[in-house]
């Protein structure tokens, strides 16, 4: 394909983009190989809309409660609480964009270029900041449990600097989306929100494909496996009273992370290898990859509403904190509060939850 001899809009002619929405996958019109006729065995768009709506409601409720409980527990707030606060905020911001993405599944992108840039930016920032914060939590628990180091991690200014750095790095990594996203109006199909990078669109998009796979999955995953691996080893050797509970939380963190993001990133890796000619591309493989990307992306979206369940609802401290808030506002009796409840719903930065 020669971008210099054809205009960007001409390149969209004849393509079936009526059901295309935001994805890091490359759409069928950017294939370097011979054109393939896309199969119609795609995920029902109304089913996807229902999933988006459920994730939106669960994420909005769960992450709002997490933020509320952490903000109320100022006295006993731990380092892990600060990370969880930022994680919940990132997931909440992403959840607010889901109704727009759901509407675009049905009607195409009808919201203009400004919202195209804004909601795409929020989705990218959530992707990067969320996983980077998960990695920071694993490092914090590793230092506290394996090395019994709390002096460094308990310095408030350092924790704030780390969180601000994560948000800054996430914005930097998402900057290309803000710069190059716009509403595209193909002929005879619904408009889409996608990148327009001029003559080098295909090459730039391949570069941007590598960024989320590296910074957004591989590196944080290696950090989490390393930290949680040594943390579990230490817990097995030490006879701590809350060892089994800590192990359950850690296993839940790693397991849910892998279940949500590993399938999508494996398919994304296969797609990248195919587009770089490492794996021979056929029409059958291309259609299978496109269908797998659509299906596994839903798992990644589900992760935003599962985080409150992993980090909060599994532990008793969150429930205690929520009960305290209800008691303060007179919604329940103070007699129902546990006597040994603590303000921080994760206990301490050690991760013994």
UniProtKB/Swiss-Prot annotation:
GO molecular function annotations of the record: C-C chemokine binding; C-C chemokine receptor activity; C-X-C chemokine receptor activity; interleukin-8 binding
Extracellular side: 1-45, 103-117, 181-205, 271-291
Residues carrying a glycan: 19
A single Gene Ontology CC term: external side of plasma membrane
A Pfam family hit: 7tm_1
Disulphide-bridged cysteine pairs: 116-193
GO biological process: calcium-mediated signaling; immune response; neutrophil chemotaxis; positive regulation of cytosolic calcium ion concentration
Family matches, as CDD domains: 7tmA_CXCR1_2
Subunit structure: Interacts with IL8. Interacts with GNAI2.
Protein name: C-X-C chemokine receptor type 2
UniProt source species: Gorilla gorilla gorilla (Western lowland gorilla)
Name of the encoding gene: CXCR2
């Amino acid at each position: 394909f020669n971008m210099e001899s054809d205009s960007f809009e001409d390149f969209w002619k004849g393509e079936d983009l009526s059901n295309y929405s935001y994805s890091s996958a490359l759409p069928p019109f950017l294939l370097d190989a011979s054109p393939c006729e896309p199969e119609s065995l795609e995920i029902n768009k109304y089913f996807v809309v229902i999933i988006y709506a459920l994730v939106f409601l669960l994420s909005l409720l769960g992450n709002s409660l997490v933020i509320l409980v952490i903000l109320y527990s100022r006295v006993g707030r731990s380092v892990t609480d600060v990370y969880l606060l930022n994680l919940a905020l990132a997931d909440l911001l992403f959840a607010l964009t889901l109704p727009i993405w759901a509407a675009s599944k049905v009607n195409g992108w009808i919201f203009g270029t400004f919202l195209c840039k804004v909601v795409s930016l929020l989705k990218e920032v959530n992707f990067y900041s969320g996983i980077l914060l998960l990695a920071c939590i694993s490092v914090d628990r590793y230092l506290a449990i394996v090395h019994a180091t709390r002096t460094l991690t308990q310095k408030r200014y350092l924790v704030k600097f780390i969180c601000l750095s994560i948000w800054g790095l996430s914005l930097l990594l998402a900057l290309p989306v803000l710069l190059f996203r716009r509403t595209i109006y193909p002929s005879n199909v619904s408009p889409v929100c996608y990148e327009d990078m001029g003559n080098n669109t295909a090459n730039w998009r391949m570069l941007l494909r590598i960024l989320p796979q590296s910074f957004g999955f591989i590196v944080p995953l290696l950090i989490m496996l390393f930290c949680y691996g040594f943390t579990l080893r230490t817990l097995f050797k030490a006879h701590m009273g809350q060892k089994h509970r800590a192990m359950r939380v850690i296993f839940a963190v790693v397991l849910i992370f892998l279940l949500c993001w590993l399938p999508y990133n494996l398919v994304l890796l296969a797609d990248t290898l195919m587009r770089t000619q490492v794996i021979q591309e056929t029409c059958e493989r291309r259609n299978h990859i496109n269908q797998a990307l659509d299906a596994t992306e839903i798992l990644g979206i589900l992760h935003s509403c599962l985080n409150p369940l992993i980090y909060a609802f599994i532990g008793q401290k969150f429930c205690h904190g929520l009960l305290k808030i209800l008691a303060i506002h007179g919604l329940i009796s103070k007699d129902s509060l546990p006597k040994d409840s603590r303000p921080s719903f994760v206990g301490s930065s050690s991760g013994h939850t």
